[in-house]
Amino acid sequence: MKADIHPNYVEIEATCSCGNVIKTRSTLGKNISIDVCSECHPFYTGKQKVLDTGGRIDRFKQRFGVFGSK
């Protein structure tokens, strides 16, 4: 590796909107603010909402189901 061409890699704090503080390293060089983290994201907390896409299938069968029956 060449000397003096690489960016400075320092420790920063990423502060979430829920109040959680994560210490990490970055070349940005300043603390950042994030919207979601693993403490408040629905995927990690288990409070994930499941979207119902079955309505589209039912609507299709309702419109075109007549053509399938003889």
UniProtKB/Swiss-Prot annotation:
InterPro entries: Ribosomal_bL28/bL31-like_sf, Ribosomal_bL31, Ribosomal_bL31_A, Ribosomal_bL31_sf. Zn(2+) binds at residues 16, 18, 37, 40. Gene3D superfamilies: Ribosomal protein L31. Keywords: Metal-binding, Ribonucleoprotein, Ribosomal protein, RNA-binding, rRNA-binding, Zinc. GO terms for molecular function: metal ion binding; rRNA binding; structural constituent of ribosome. GO terms for biological process: translation. Its cofactor is Zn(2+). GO terms for cellular component: ribonucleoprotein complex; ribosome. SUPFAM superfamilies: L28p-like. The keyword Iron-sulfur does not apply. Binds 1 zinc ion per subunit. Binds the 23S rRNA. Belongs to the bacterial ribosomal protein bL31 family. Type A subfamily. Part of the 50S ribosomal subunit. This is Large ribosomal subunit protein bL31.
